[in-house]
């Protein structure tokens, strides 16, 4: 489903601000894989997601999504393969439009249609049905402006919008980091439910080691732009956060000094 073949990226090469962000990242996801990604600030987690999304072009290597080489495709041409949810609940939705209109935009993405044609009764019924699966009562608030929703409600809606067209790959970039612990837990549970029910392939960046082990069937740990650990489902089931810390220190040769990674 996803083949990241030895990609590398250096920002501002030759300048005093030169930064090697990715160094020979090689990662392969089978269809249905749900991979959690963890590492300290600057480890390369979000940069890897951005590379897949086409936010920038890689210096070396290739990226293949569902058999299609997208390495040299611009971001907007890759969008049809991807669903994406960012850390900020304000991203991914239009605050001044209502819930129904936001879903219509997501549903018609790539179809060359706009809201000028109106929302059909069939589409409205489908949106209501999808919203009901969130368990937040949003199906009864479809005319409400999205800007009036809470952060958790908005992030749940963004997640639904990102998956409503069954993307080949779902990218989740710390999508619960801005939420309070209870709301974050609810959104993570919902995330796992949507991924499982729709048989999606997904990558989720997190700083929370407990969440990294609890969700998904693989956990990738990055350090200084490299993948240093790739933990399979069976290993995930039997290790704890403390074990993961030891594994990191052995693989990287250094201690974790980012407090955010010790949460949970």
Mark where each language-model region is.
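The feature captures the beta-strand-to-loop junction immediately N-terminal to the Walker
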Residues: 38-40
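H-loop/switch region of ABC-family ATPase nucleotide-binding domains
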Residues: 206-207
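Conserved beta-strand-loop-alpha-helix hinge in the C-terminal portion
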Residues: 226-252
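Conserved ABC transporter NBD signature motif
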Residues: 61-68, 231
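A short, flexible loop at the N-terminus of ABC-type nucleotide-binding domains that lies
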Residues: 1, 10-24, 74
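ABC ATPase C-loop
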Residues: 162-163
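Helix-to-loop junction immediately C-terminal to a conserved catalytic motif
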Residues: 53
């Amino acid at each position: 489903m996803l083949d990241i073949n030895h990609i590398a990226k250096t920002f501002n090469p030759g300048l005093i601000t030169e930064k090697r962000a990715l160094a020979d990242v090689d990662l392969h996801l089978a269809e249905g894989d749900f991979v959690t990604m963890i590492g300290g600030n600057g480890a390369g987690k979000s940069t890897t997601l951005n590379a897949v999304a086409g936010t920038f072009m890689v210096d070396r290597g290739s990226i293949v999504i569902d058999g299609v080489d997208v390495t040299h495709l611009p971001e907007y041409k890759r969008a049809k393969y991807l669903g994406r949810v960012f850390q900020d609940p304000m991203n991914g939705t239009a605050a001044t439009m209502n819930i129904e209109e936001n879903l219509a935009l997501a549903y018609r993405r790539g179809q060359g249609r706009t809201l000028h044609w109106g929302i059909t009764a069939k589409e409205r019924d489908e949106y209501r049905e999808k919203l009901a699966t969130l368990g937040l009562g949003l199906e009864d608030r479809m005319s409400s402006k999205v800007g009036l929703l809470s952060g958790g409600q908005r992030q749940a809606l963004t997640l639904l919008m990102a998956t409503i067209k069954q993307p080949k790959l779902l990218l989740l970039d710390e999508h619960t980091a801005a939420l309070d612990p209870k709301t974050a837990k609810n959104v993570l549970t919902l995330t796992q439910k949507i991924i499982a029910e729709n048989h999606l392939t997904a990558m989720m960046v997190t700083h929370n080691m407990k969440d990294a082990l609890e969700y998904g069937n693989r956990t990738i740990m990055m350090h200084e732009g490299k993948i240093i650990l790739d933990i399979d489902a069976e290993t995930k089931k039997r290790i704890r956060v403390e074990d993961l810390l030891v594994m990191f220190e052995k693989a990287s040769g250094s201690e974790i000094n980012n407090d955010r990674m010790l949460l949970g």
